[in-house]
């Protein structure tokens, strides 16, 4: 399919069916679009909307975000996952405040230099908010292009990604780039979906190789399978009345900057920790274990609950706090921690 025909059909479809009333599309600014694009990485629109609205209510400008404590940013992000995005968001806001006087940059080089912003995200920010001519290549766009032009291979491979970038550059029109880029994302999200694509409703159906051959399932190529390693972590749920001991993780690494229960490799290490602090372990109870899967390994979590009668010996770590179940503080929590806290709120753990 010729590039001009491709873009014309996509734009015509967008004018009729595309999404035009998402929260970040109303009174668009580079800041709003940046925030939405970071949230939309690895996350669907329906999930992102309430998070976006909460962030905009609390941080209406990039300076507000830059001046906020990281704990508060992570707290508002809790549940959205991939927390490195939130840490990079905060770093980038501070960079904008420091280097650009609080005005979101408007050149590709400056936007792409922000933490957590790559080529596609930078292109999306500048094209969607300012109409600047930059192609994009997010997951939805990769899928549309790979199927239409039968580009084989996993897009994570550099040579495959380069082919898709070349196609994206070719089909992105000189005029209407803002509508076109939004249309491509909408097309991938609404029509050219991962499974059960609605080919009969697609504006590209007559020129799409995958549609003609009914081979959409082959494109884009899947990531080579790998067996994820398994690890075990013992979480200590130390509870005093309505409060539970949490400790902040180091700034980088797993759950960086988030609050978590004290974690141990095995039960013996956990009991040693208690003994060193002269905390009796007589009532230590194992709760139901569960699995939490990261992108690179499985973590089998074994919660160990222990009610204590006083705080003595529990607060020797400077990064620890007693988390009030009834009046929770504004701190970021790892998803399994939130799950266990909710379990404690509902009554006796099981």
From Swiss-Prot:
SMART domains: ENDO3c (SM00478), FES (SM00525). One of its GO terms (molecular function) is metal ion binding. Pfam families: EndIII_4Fe-2S, HHH, HhH-GPD, NUDIX_4. Its EC number is 3.2.2.31. PROSITE patterns: ENDONUCLEASE_III_1 (PS00764), ENDONUCLEASE_III_2 (PS01155). One of its GO terms (biological process) is base-excision repair. Binds 1 [4Fe-4S] cluster. The cluster does not appear to play a role in catalysis, but is probably involved in the proper positioning of the enzyme along the DNA strand. Its cofactor is [4Fe-4S] cluster. The record marks 138 as: Transition state stabilizer. It catalyses: Hydrolyzes free adenine bases from 7,8-dihydro-8-oxoguanine:adenine mismatched double-stranded DNA, leaving an apurinic site. Keywords: 4Fe-4S, DNA damage, DNA repair, Glycosidase, Hydrolase, Iron, Iron-sulfur, Metal-binding. The active site is at 37 (proton donor/acceptor). InterPro entries: A/G_AdeGlyc_MutY, DNA_glycosylase, Endonuclease-III-like_CS2, Endonuclease3_FeS-loop_motif, Endouclease-III_FeS-bd_BS, HhH-GPD_domain, HhH_base_excis_C, HhH_motif. It comes from the Bacteria. [4Fe-4S] cluster binds at residues 192, 199, 202, 208. Adenine glycosylase active on G-A mispairs. MutY also corrects error-prone DNA synthesis past GO lesions which are due to the oxidatively damaged form of guanine: 7,8-dihydro-8-oxoguanine (8-oxo-dGTP). Belongs to the Nth/MutY family. Monomer. This is Adenine DNA glycosylase. It comes from Escherichia coli (strain K12). The lineage of its organism: Bacteria, Pseudomonadati, Pseudomonadota, Gammaproteobacteria, Enterobacterales. The gene is mutY.
